[in-house]
């Protein structure tokens, strides 16, 4: 699905993946937000499952990413306002908002800025603040190949880096490298700089007014579970998040452990009174 968010920060064509299904007003909606240097395809298994089990799915390519035109937006706050505009444009009512990495920061800021919009929140592979190593941030400007290699080194568990994959015949690190290569020059740096500069995470968490899942992975070296504690404690006492840690994946958990990620999201959403899990 393509649409134009006319008059907003990005007056360009936006591509949204819907899992191969039409949006229906009588269905609950899940809005998936990808991370830095990626596009909607990182959510392929999860979005298709939701779309074929009674849910509307909206998985946009952020501005300047994938099939969406325009420049990449430079701050998490601008990206959050863009997501809010997209949700209103599509007429979605209180979607579940799910984000990974940079997308999780965006989702968090969306829930803080427009708490009336979000029914449930799932933050996958997140910490706040989310500092980016200077060597990686420099490489995103000066040497894209090096940046991609560093990201693969830090994003995947050791067994994935030597060829293990839940999908036979798929090289996960090569697939991730090709995905990053498809983004326009400068997009990865803009994304990483936005993550590095975002300092509003604790304030945002305190403003969240919906059930929240913090989904981590034990072998994640970019957003390790132990670094999540400060953000987890920043949530309002009436809205303490549910924490789940997957045992066998790294930061790229949607591709390393796609079924486990889906199971964790589905179980959390189904357990909440606002979730409309199908029979």
State the predicted function of each range.
Residues 233-251:
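Catalytic histidine neighborhood in serine/cysteine hydrolases
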Residues 208, 214-216, 220:
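Short beta-strand/loop motif that positions the catalytic acidic residue
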Residues 249-262:
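Catalytic histidine-centered segment of alpha/beta-hydrolase-like enzymes
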Residues 2, 9-20, 44-52, 56-102, ...:
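Active-site loop/oxyanion-hole signature of alpha/beta-hydrolase fold enzymes
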Residues 105-150:
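Flexible "cap/lid" loop of the alpha/beta hydrolase fold
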Residues 210, 224-233:
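Short alpha-helix in the alpha/beta-hydrolase fold that links the catalytic acid
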Residues 138-209:
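Conserved alpha/beta-hydrolase catalytic His-Asp/Glu region
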Residues 35-38, 101:
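Active-site glycine-rich loops that stabilize anionic/oxyanionic intermediates
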């Amino acid at each position: 699905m393509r649409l134009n968010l006319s008059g907003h920060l990005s007056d360009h064509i936006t591509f949204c993946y819907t899992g191969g299904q039409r949006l229906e007003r009588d269905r609950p909606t899940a809005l998936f937000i990808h991370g830095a240097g990626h596009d909607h395809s990182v959510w392929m298994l999860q979005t298709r499952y939701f779309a074929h089990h009674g849910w509307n799915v909206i998985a946009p390519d952020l501005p300047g990413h994938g099939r969406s035109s325009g420049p990449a937006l430079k701050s998490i706050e601008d990206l959050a306002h863009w997501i809010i505009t997209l949700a209103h444009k599509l007429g979605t009512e209180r979607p579940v908002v799910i984000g990974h990495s940079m997308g999780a920061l965006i989702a968090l800021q969306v829930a803080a800025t427009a708490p009336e919009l979000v029914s449930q929140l799932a933050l996958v592979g997140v910490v706040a603040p989310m500092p980016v190593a200077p060597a990686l941030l420099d490489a995103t400007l000066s040497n894209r190949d090096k940046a991609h290699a560093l990201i693969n080194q830090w994003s995947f568990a050791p067994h994935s880096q030597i060829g293990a994959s839940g999908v036979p015949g798929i090289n996960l690190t090569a697939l991730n490298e090709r995905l990053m290569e498809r983004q326009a020059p400068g997009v990865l740096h803009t994304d990483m700089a936005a993550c590095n500069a975002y300092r509003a995470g604790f304030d945002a968490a305190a403003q969240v007014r919906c059930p929240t899942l913090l989904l981590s992975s034990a072998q994640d070296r970019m957003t390790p579970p132990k670094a999540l504690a400060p953000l987890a404690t920043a949530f309002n006492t009436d809205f303490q998040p549910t924490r789940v840690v997957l045992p066998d994946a790294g930061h790229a958990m949607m591709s390393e452990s796609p079924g486990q990620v889906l199971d964790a999201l589905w179980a959390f959403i189904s357990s909440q009174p606002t979730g409309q899990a199908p029979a």
